[in-house]
Amino acid sequence: MFEEVLQESFDEREKKVLKFWQEGQLFERSVENRKGQPLFTFYDGPPFATGLPHYGHILAGTIKDVVLRYKTMKGFCAPRRFGWDCHGLPVENEIEKTFGLSGAKSIEEFGIAKFNEECRNIVLRYTEEWKFTVNRMGRWVDFNQTYRTMDLPFMESVWWVFKQLYAKGLVYEGLKVMPFSAKLGTPLSNFEASENYKEVDDPSLTVAFQSRDNSNTYFLAWTTTPWTLVSNLALMVSPMIEYAEVQDHVSKRNYILATERLKGYYKDSGEYTIVRKFPGSELEGQHYIPLFDYFNDRAHSGAFKIILEDSISVEEGTGIVQTAPAFGEIDFYACQKAGIDPVCPVDNNGQFTDEIPEYKGIFVKEADKDIIKRLKQQAKVIHQGTCHHRYPFCPRSDTPLIYKTVRTWFVAVEKIKDRLLAANSQIHWTPEHIQYGRFGKWLEGARDWAISRNRYWGTPIPLWRAQDGEIHVVGSIEELKQLTGNPLTDLHRHFIDEMSFEKNGKTFKRIPEVFDCWFESGSMPYAQNHYPFENRELFEQNFPADFIAEGLDQTRGWFYTLTVLSAALFDQPAMKNVIVNGLILAENGAKMSKRLKNYPDPAEVIQQYGADAIRLYMLHSPAVKADDLSFSKSGVELVLRQILLPLWNAYTFFLTYARIYNWKPGKLVQKPELAIDQWIISLLNKLVHEVEQGMDDYDLSRSVEPFVNFVDQLTNWYIRRSRRRFWDDKESPNRTQAFETLYYVLIELTKISAPYVPFISEAIYQNLRSCDMPESVHLCDFPHYQQLSRHEKLEAEMEAVQVTVSLGHALRKEHKLKVRQPLATAQLASADPKVLDFLKEQQHLISEELNVKEITFSSNEKDFVSLKAKPNFRVLGKKVGKLMKLAQLTIEQFGQKELTELLNHRSVEIILEGHPVLLTSEDVQVERIVREGIIAANQGTITIALNTNLNKELLLEGLAREIVNKVNTMRREANFAVTDRIQLYMQTTTRVIECFDQYKNYICQEVLATDVQFGPYEGTDWDLNGEPTKIIIKKSEY
C-alpha cells in the first residue's frame, strides 16, 4: 500500500506537490466542493505589479492563505480573488525614468495620451513573476478572475462612490497646507506623508525681528525652515507663557523671548539685564518690521504683527515662532483666525516664483544658505545651529516633502469621525491592541482627506465645472454619455479631459485632477464587483468582508481608507476581522533595501529550504502579532531542522516498518489500551481544540505554537518511547496497536498542519491515504474535537514526568554524566500529593528515561529545598500601589506558616501602615531554592536529586551503551537497512573486552550483530568512554 520514500530535497518534493495540485485543479475543486455552504468573504489588498514580490508580500500572503485554507476545511465556501493596483505614482515614476521626464511640464510636452498608454503597457510587467512566487509559496488564489483598478468597470464604481460622498455633503474643495512632493508636483495625504520619516539635519536659526514701536527692541523668533522667512507674515506667541524683555550687554539691544528660554541663549545671567517680565497675551497686536520687502503691502491688511497660539512650546527655540501661513498648518489656522491671508510664492516644483525675484526658479531648500547669509549681513541672525530631527520624505520619490498651501479636493473625514470610531468598535483586530491603539488613535486624530492629485495615470475625478464655479458630478458612464453625446470606451484622462457639455446655458469642463490611488483601493469592495451597476446581490452577500490581512503600515493606508469609505457610505465597517502583521526587516534590523542587497533572494531561500519552512518560520514568529521580524536564513534553516525534518522523519519511521512488516490499516481502529497511545491521541485532540480556538479567534500565534509543540512530543517522546514496539519481529497486539495509533495520528496531523505547511502535509497524506479518503488533504474536513478521547489526568501525569526527566538530564549535563551512563538512584520529592502520585505511577518510565536503577519518593521537599517568598510585582503593584516597598519587605520575612498557606492556594493577611491587605498565591511567588551540598534541581512542585557515585558495574553498563551508540552511528552512515545484520570487528582494550564478556547479548541484539571478532584491525577510530577503539562493520551473509 505504501510507496517507498525517495531521497530528495524539500524543494524537489514541493514541486511535485505543486504539479499534483495544478493537474488535479485542487484549488478550484476545494472552492467548488463547498458551494452552497456558508460563504466566507475575503478581500485581498491589491499590490502593484510594477515591482517584484518581497518578503512582506510573502508574509501577508501566507497569513491569508492559512486562514482561507482553514476556513475551507471547516466547511466554508471561501473564494479568493486576486487584484492589481494599477494606477498611481509608482507606475508614473517608471515611465518618467524610462523617457527622461521630470515634472508636469515635461510630461505634458511628451503628451498625456502617450504617457498614459506607456503607463498602461508596463503596469502588469511582473504579473508572471507574481503568479510564480504566489503559487510556489503554496498560496491558493484565483488569478483567472482578477480585478484591476485601471479597468473600466472598476473606475466607474469609483465614480459612483465619489458621487455618493458628494451627495452626502462629504466632499469639498479647499485651500489647506498639505504635505507636498515637489518632485512629483502633487500634494499627498497626511497618512502618505507619515510613511517615510527620516532622521535629518536642518539649519536652526534664531532671527531678530525689529519692533515697529521701538527701534532698539527685537522679537527673537526661531525657525528650522529659513526659506519660509521670505514669506513671513506674523509672529506667534503663547498667552500662557511668561516672556522677558532683556537688555543684551554686548549688542546693547533689547530682546524679547520666553523667560524659560533665556538659559538657551545666555550662559550666564550676568550677560543680560531683565527689563520686565509679562505674559504672552500682552504682546498680541504689536507690530514689527518685516525682514524682507517682498510683501510689504500686506502690512495694510493686518500682516507683520504678533498673534496668539496656544500650541507654542518652550522645549526649544525662543517661545516665539516666525509664521509663514502658506507653509505650516498651525501657522495657516492661526493667521486665518487673525485675518491674515497667506502668500505662496512657491510653485508645484517646489521652486520660488517671480514674486521672489532673487530666488526665482530655485528649489526652496537650496535657498536656505543665501537667505541666512543676507540676514547675517543685516545683523539679524542671533544664533545659527543645526537641528537633528525626523522629517517626512515622499514615499514614492524618496525626496524631502515641503508643506505648502494647495487648493485641493477633500473628503470631510472630520465630519464623520464619530462614525469611523463606531465602525472600528465593530471590528475584531489581531493583535487586539491595534483597535484602540495605533488604528484607534489614528482615527481619533484623523484629518480631512485630500483625495485629488495633480497627476495623469489614475482615475479622473468626475467633476465638471462651469466658468461661474457651478459643479456637476458625474457618477456613471451612462450619465457622461448622455451629457456629452460621446461614446465611452475608457475613462482615463486622455479619453475624457476634452469632453465638455452644455447645461443651463453654461459650458462645463472637467477639472484636471485624478484620484489618490488610495481612494481606489478603499473603493475595492464595491469596484471589484462593478457595484452598483452589476452584481448587487453578490456585493450584499460579500459585504462587509469576514476577513482581511495586511501589514502594520496599512493602519494608515488601506485599513483606513476602507473604513472611511464604508462608514461614509453604509455606516458600518468594510471588514469584520483583521490580522495585522509586522514588518520584515533585514537580519541586522535595518530596512530591506534592493540597493544594499541586505537580504537573501526569496527564490534562493525557497530553493534551499522549501516554501513550507519559510511559511512556518514566519508564522512562528512575532510578525503575526504585528511585531517586526529580522529575517534570517538561519531562522528558516532552524525551522526545517527542528520541526519539518522531525515531522518527515516520524512519517518515514512509520513507513519503513509498515513496509517491512507489510502492515495495512484496518477498517476499524481499536481503542488503544496502552497509556502512551492514549496519551498521544489525547494530545492530538487537545491540539485540534487549541488550533480551532486560535484560528477561530484569528490568533495565528496561539494556533501555531501548539502544532510546533505537538511535533516535538510526537517525535521526541511518543516515537522514541515506542520504537521497540515497531521493531518487534513477531506480529502482536502491541505492535499492531503501535502502527494503528501512529498511522491515525499522522493522518489527522496532516489535516491540522495543512493550512500552515501545505506541501509536506500533502506529501505525507498522499502516501498514507486509503482509496476511500478524499484525493487531497486540502479537500478534507478539519478534524473534529473528540472530548471522549481526552485524558487530562494522563496528560498531567506525562507533563510531570517530562519535567522530571528534563530536570534529571540538566543535572547530568551539569555534572558531565552522559544519559547512557546508568546511575544507582534518584530521589523525587513533591509536597503536592497528586504530583507525587503521578510520578509514582510512571516510575518505570522515569527510571528508563533517566537511566537510574532505583527511584525513591518523598513528600518532604524541605530535605532538598528551602522556600522563599517574593512579591509578584506586576500583580501586587495594582493592589498596594505606593506601599510596594513595604509589602516586599513584609513578604520576604514570611515563615513556614505563611508559605504553607500560599502553597495550598489560601490567602494570607498582612498589615501595611495600619491597613489589612489580603494576599493570594497570585500576589506572591513561592520560590524553591536547592540546599547546598545536594545534587538536585527543582521546577515548580517537583524536585529531583541524583546519586552520581559510579561503581564498576555501572561503568561497564555505561560502556556497553556507548558501544551500541557508536556502532549504530556507523550503521546509519553506511546507509544499512534497519533489518540488515552485521559482523563486528574491533581492535580495543581489555576493559572493552571485559564489557563484552558481560553484555555481549545486549550489544549484539541492539546493533543486530551476528558475530564479534577482536584483533589487530584497521577501522574507524572511536573513544569509548576513554577506551581507544577501532571498529569495522560488515553486512552479515546469514
UniProtKB/Swiss-Prot annotation:
<keyword id="KW-0862">Zinc</keyword>
<dbReference type="InterPro" id="IPR009008">
    <property type="entry name" value="Val/Leu/Ile-tRNA-synth_edit"/>
</dbReference>
<dbReference type="InterPro" id="IPR014729">
    <property type="entry name" value="Rossmann-like_a/b/a_fold"/>
</dbReference>
<dbReference type="InterPro" id="IPR033709">
    <property type="entry name" value="Anticodon_Ile_ABEc"/>
</dbReference>
<dbReference type="InterPro" id="IPR002300">
    <property type="entry name" value="aa-tRNA-synth_Ia"/>
</dbReference>
<dbReference type="InterPro" id="IPR023586">
    <property type="entry name" value="Ile-tRNA-ligase_type2"/>
</dbReference>
<dbReference type="InterPro" id="IPR001412">
    <property type="entry name" value="aa-tRNA-synth_I_CS"/>
</dbReference>
<keyword id="KW-0648">Protein biosynthesis</keyword>
<dbReference type="Pfam" id="PF00133">
    <property type="entry name" value="tRNA-synt_1"/>
</dbReference>
<comment type="function">
    <text>Catalyzes the attachment of isoleucine to tRNA(Ile). As IleRS can inadvertently accommodate and process structurally similar amino acids such as valine, to avoid such errors it has two additional distinct tRNA(Ile)-dependent editing activities. One activity is designated as 'pretransfer' editing and involves the hydrolysis of activated Val-AMP. The other activity is designated 'posttransfer' editing and involves deacylation of mischarged Val-tRNA(Ile).</text>
</comment>
<dbReference type="Pfam" id="PF08264">
    <property type="entry name" value="Anticodon_1"/>
</dbReference>
<feature type="binding site">
    <location>
        <position position="594"/>
    </location>
    <ligand>
        <name>ATP</name>
    </ligand>
</feature>
<dbReference type="GO" id="GO:0005524">
    <property type="term" value="F:ATP binding"/>
</dbReference>
<dbReference type="Pfam" id="PF19302">
    <property type="entry name" value="DUF5915"/>
</dbReference>
<dbReference type="InterPro" id="IPR009080">
    <property type="entry name" value="tRNAsynth_Ia_anticodon-bd"/>
</dbReference>
<keyword id="KW-0436">Ligase</keyword>
<keyword id="KW-0030">Aminoacyl-tRNA synthetase</keyword>
<dbReference type="GO" id="GO:0005737">
    <property type="term" value="C:cytoplasm"/>
</dbReference>
<feature type="short sequence motif" description="'KMSKS' region">
    <location>
        <begin position="591"/>
        <end position="595"/>
    </location>
</feature>
<dbReference type="InterPro" id="IPR013155">
    <property type="entry name" value="M/V/L/I-tRNA-synth_anticd-bd"/>
</dbReference>
<dbReference type="GO" id="GO:0006428">
    <property type="term" value="P:isoleucyl-tRNA aminoacylation"/>
</dbReference>
<keyword id="KW-0963">Cytoplasm</keyword>
<keyword id="KW-0479">Metal-binding</keyword>
<protein>
    <recommendedName>
        <fullName>Isoleucine--tRNA ligase</fullName>
        <ecNumber>6.1.1.5</ecNumber>
    </recommendedName>
</protein>
<dbReference type="GO" id="GO:0002161">
    <property type="term" value="F:aminoacyl-tRNA deacylase activity"/>
</dbReference>
<dbReference type="GO" id="GO:0008270">
    <property type="term" value="F:zinc ion binding"/>
</dbReference>
<keyword id="KW-0547">Nucleotide-binding</keyword>
<comment type="similarity">
    <text>Belongs to the class-I aminoacyl-tRNA synthetase family. IleS type 2 subfamily.</text>
</comment>
<dbReference type="GO" id="GO:0000049">
    <property type="term" value="F:tRNA binding"/>
</dbReference>
<dbReference type="GO" id="GO:0004822">
    <property type="term" value="F:isoleucine-tRNA ligase activity"/>
</dbReference>
<dbReference type="InterPro" id="IPR002301">
    <property type="entry name" value="Ile-tRNA-ligase"/>
</dbReference>
<comment type="subunit">
    <text>Monomer.</text>
</comment>
<keyword id="KW-0067">ATP-binding</keyword>
<feature type="short sequence motif" description="'HIGH' region">
    <location>
        <begin position="47"/>
        <end position="57"/>
    </location>
</feature>
